[in-house]
Amino acid sequence: MPELPEVETVKRGLTPAMEGTRVTRLELRRGDLRFPFPDAFADRVSGRTIVGLGRRAKYLLVDLDDGNTLISHLGMSGSFRIEEGAASGVPGEFHHARSKDEKHDHVVFHLQAASGLRRVVYNDPRRFGFMDMVGRADLATHPFFRDLGPEPTGNELSAAYLAERFRDKAQPLKSALLDQKNIAGLGNIYVCEALWRSHLSPIRAAGTLVTAGGRPKAQLDLLVASIRDVIADAIAAGGSSLRDHIQTDGSLGYFQHSFSVYDRESQACRTPGCGGTVARIVQAGRSTFYCATCQK
């Protein structure tokens, strides 16, 4: 499933293609994705101008000129592609040679841009993604967002904040980091990578990173820095392409070539001088990769 860096990459790819354009028609080629589309969805979007794109956690946000925001979640296999006029406007004939089967094109944004007509197509073979619509003023209280913690890239995330959340918690550290109420948008891949960078075991209790007085230990400061760094590195690399993720220009993210522990079971740990081996365990139904030698 695309994680925060992948969704951020998609947002950055779509912004120059969609921002400032008018939706001449929203074409729905079926009645639902994972969930049914909102009532009168096509009518409510058609004719509107897109004033901006954003992201919250793993959700893509498309702001319209009437004060509404379209919410899109990519699910397991969702992706967008951009087409100029009747042909692709991206290098490599992405939508012909590199796209998924066009029979899985479920939503088409027909756009009028200053340069001419354009289409942005949502493709989703597994149909595990979904779309919704909400007034921008109500976004923070929408069920998708009201319980989310701070973004891992924002100033709200700090060691002091996590100390408050983790204090006296026996919950495994990895599980605490994946809890979207603690940090929004942080997923399995990047939690594994951040824990490796900060030399912390995924199975240790989250509360052990907090002093008896409730202050963050130095290890928690290092963890916050590692989270920021791994997310920034992944965004710079275009995200990770595992199974189904494709960027809007058809290219594949390549941060997976920089994985230090994720999906490296039985391989040598990359911490200099460690000498350990990457192990795989299962926590809450998800694979965890870590080095028991240097992650404590």
Curated annotation (Swiss-Prot):
Zinc finger boundaries on the chain: FPG-type = 260-296
| EC number from the UniProt entry | 3.2.2.23, 4.2.99.18
- List residues binding DNA: H104, R126, K169
Q: How is the cofactor bound?
A: Binds 1 zinc ion per subunit.
Please list the reactions this protein catalyses: Hydrolysis of DNA containing ring-opened 7-methylguanine residues, releasing 2,6-diamino-4-hydroxy-5-(N-methyl)formamidopyrimidine; 2'-deoxyribonucleotide-(2'-deoxyribose 5'-phosphate)-2'-deoxyribonucleotide-DNA = a 3'-end 2'-deoxyribonucleotide-(2,3-dehydro-2,3-deoxyribose 5'-phosphate)-DNA + a 5'-end 5'-phospho-2'-deoxyribonucleoside-DNA + H(+)
Q: Where is the active site?
A: P2, E3, K58, R286
Requisite cofactors: Zn(2+)
GO biological process: what's one of them?
base-excision repair
User: Does the record carry NAD as a key word?
Assistant: no
Keywords annotated in UniProt = DNA damage, DNA repair, DNA-binding, Glycosidase, Hydrolase, Lyase, Metal-binding, Multifunctional enzyme, Zinc, Zinc-finger
* Gene Ontology molecular function terms on file: 8-oxo-7,8-dihydroguanine DNA N-glycosylase activity; class I DNA-(apurinic or apyrimidinic site) endonuclease activity; damaged DNA binding; zinc ion binding
Reading the lineage from the top rank, the first entry is Bacteria
Subunit structure, per the record? Monomer.
What does the protein in this record do?
Answer: Involved in base excision repair of DNA damaged by oxidation or by mutagenic agents. Acts as a DNA glycosylase that recognizes and removes damaged bases. Has a preference for oxidized purines, such as 7,8-dihydro-8-oxoguanine (8-oxoG). Has AP (apurinic/apyrimidinic) lyase activity and introduces nicks in the DNA strand. Cleaves the DNA backbone by beta-delta elimination to generate a single-strand break at the site of the removed base with both 3'- and 5'-phosphates.
Sequence similarity: Belongs to the FPG family.
- The protein, known as: Formamidopyrimidine-DNA glycosylase
